[in-house]
């Protein structure tokens, strides 16, 4: 098989197999071909991974942040040297076009290792607090063994986004990728060892829904970071809360993207397309509710239709391809079901809505789809679809659109397109979301915090904020005189 790894798991610096685990077949979404066959972690594999992480962590934490950072920065260099190889693996794993993966997947993972490797020494400093004759100081200390649970839309990126800050702060990690995309994280673990990371600090185990609870409920795990769905997030949060474990989670969204009538039309349409069709719509922060001011609605839709129908759908390994298949048949069928529901509830289909011609019929392809005349009550405007389905809604004024944009259980992201920056800042101040964009969309460089509010989770990926989530504050009071006691 074209992408078969040496074994299913990577524990304590080496590949490990246990064929007693449930079989996981890695399927190339473009052809339906089985490209690798792995096994889910048994309870014994879970124990081995956590034991390795627990054993290795204290010595790693005792190293200077500069020394830890040097290893992470070397991992970033190796990832960049092998960007093509890693990008092709990511395309096989996810079905995303090589045109995307070569600029957005391993590269963002490398950015994460480089960034956290570079800031560890400075960002982990504490404070000195003078108290007259006495004084106190604070220091940030690692949590211990951390668990990362990944999603299938950006498997390599997520493996790095969770691993880099955890390791920079002096923790160890056990990472479980999605069973849909099991391959990329194994390569990240390999590269970290090559970069000089001591064995046991970054372990990868495969698994399904039964594996997560074994990790989350383990008494030696101090922290859990999840990227996934809201229902999964609630289960993980409840389990972590029962043991008072640290937890951060980046969950789903149904984000608003607001286009005022003074916006640059081409830029706004480009932002809406990036916020709906990139990665075949499988991005949690997508602006899938596109609110367009009524005055420009017709012009917006006409040009959007032209540009959408010009998207090149095809072989993900062809660098001309702009839209690949969905990650799995189950996900494609789910999206097609939402499209049928949209039509049944009265939304107007502008373009797309089906399976494209002239592609591999065994692949899980779907047309980029645009609905107009969508109302707030429709299912496609309320529920996360996680596919290339854009809902265009009309609005008249600012107060109306802000209220409607906020009328959702989610709060991951939002975007505003307008030539009036005063209005843009006024609107984003009112929008209930964790990550917002003005006159652009879905850019998430490692330097800025990324995360949501409401049902979209809590905590932040990236930036110094992420590093803080992998540490806790220790306060030390130093008495400089004799103790006076009334006893």
UniProtKB/Swiss-Prot annotation:
Modified residues (Cysteine sulfenic acid (-SOH)): 284
A GO biological process held by the record: glycine betaine biosynthetic process from choline
Reaction equation(s) it catalyzes: betaine aldehyde + NAD(+) + H2O = glycine betaine + NADH + 2 H(+)
The record's free-text note on cofactor binding: Binds 2 potassium ions per subunit.
Keyword entries, A-Z: Metal-binding, NAD, NADP, Oxidation, Oxidoreductase, Potassium
Gene Ontology MF term list: betaine-aldehyde dehydrogenase (NAD+) activity; metal ion binding
Binding site for K(+) 2: 244, 454, 457
Function text: Involved in the biosynthesis of the osmoprotectant glycine betaine. Catalyzes the irreversible oxidation of betaine aldehyde to the corresponding acid.
Protein name in UniProt: Betaine aldehyde dehydrogenase
Gene: betB
């Amino acid at each position: 098989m074209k992408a078969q790894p040496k074994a299913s798991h990577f524990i304590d610096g080496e590949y490990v197999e246990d064929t007693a685990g449930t079989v996981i077949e890695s399927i190339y979404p473009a052809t339906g071909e089985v490209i690798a066959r792995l096994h889910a972690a048994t309870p014994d594999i879970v124990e081995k991974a956590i034991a390795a992480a627990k054993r290795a962590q204290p010595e790693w934490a005792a190293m200077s942040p500069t020394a830890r950072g040097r290893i992470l920065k070397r991992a970033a260099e190796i990832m960049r040297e092998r960007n093509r190889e890693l990008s092709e693996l990511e395309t096989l794993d996810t079905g995303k076009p090589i045109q995307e993966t070569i600029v957005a997947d391993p590269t963002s993972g490398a950015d994460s290792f480089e960034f956290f490797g570079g800031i560890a020494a400075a960002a982990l400093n504490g404070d000195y607090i003078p108290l007259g004759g006495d004084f106190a100081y604070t220091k940030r200390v690692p949590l211990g063994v951390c668990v990362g649970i990944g999603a299938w839309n950006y498997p390599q990126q997520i493996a790095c986004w969770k691993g880099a800050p955890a390791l920079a702060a002096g923790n160890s990690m056990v990472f479980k990728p999605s069973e849909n995309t099991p391959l990329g994280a194994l390569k990240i673990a390999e590269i970290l060892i090559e970069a000089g990371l001591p064995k046991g600090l970054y372990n990868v185990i495969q698994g399904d829904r039964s594996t997560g609870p074994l990790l989350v409920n383990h008494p030696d795990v101090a922290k859990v970071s999840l990227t996934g769905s809201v229902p999964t997030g609630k289960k993980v949060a409840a389990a972590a809360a029962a043991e008072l474990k640290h937890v951060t989670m980046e969950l789903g969204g149904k984000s608003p993207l607001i286009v005022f009538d003074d916006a640059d039309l081409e830029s706004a349409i480009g932002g809406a397309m990036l916020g709906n069709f990139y990665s075949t719509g499988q991005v949690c922060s997508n602006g899938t509710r596109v609110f367009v001011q009524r005055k420009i609605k017709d012009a917006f839709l006409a040009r959007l239709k032209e540009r959408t129908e010009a998207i090149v759908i095809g072989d993900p390994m062809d660098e001309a391809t702009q839209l690949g298949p969905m990650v799995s048949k189950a996900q494609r069928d789910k999206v097609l079901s939402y499209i049928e529901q949209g039509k049944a509830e009265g939304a107007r289909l502008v373009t797309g809505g089906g399976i494209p011609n002239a592609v591999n019929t065994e692949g899980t392809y779907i047309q980029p789809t645009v609905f107009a005349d969508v109302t707030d009550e429709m299912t496609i405007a309320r529920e996360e679809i996680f596919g290339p389905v854009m809902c265009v809604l009309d609005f008249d004024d600012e107060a109306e659109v802000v209220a409607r944009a906020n009328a959702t259980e989610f709060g991951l992201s939002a975007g505003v397109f307008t030539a009036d920056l005063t209005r843009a800042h006024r609107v984003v101040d009112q929008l209930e979301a964790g990550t917002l964009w003005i006159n652009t969309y879905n850019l998430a460089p490692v330097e800025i915090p990324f995360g949501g509010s409401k049902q979209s989770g809590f905590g932040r990926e990236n930036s110094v904020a992420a590093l803080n989530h992998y540490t806790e504050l220790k306060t030390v009071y130093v008495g400089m005189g004799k103790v006076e006691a009334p006893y």
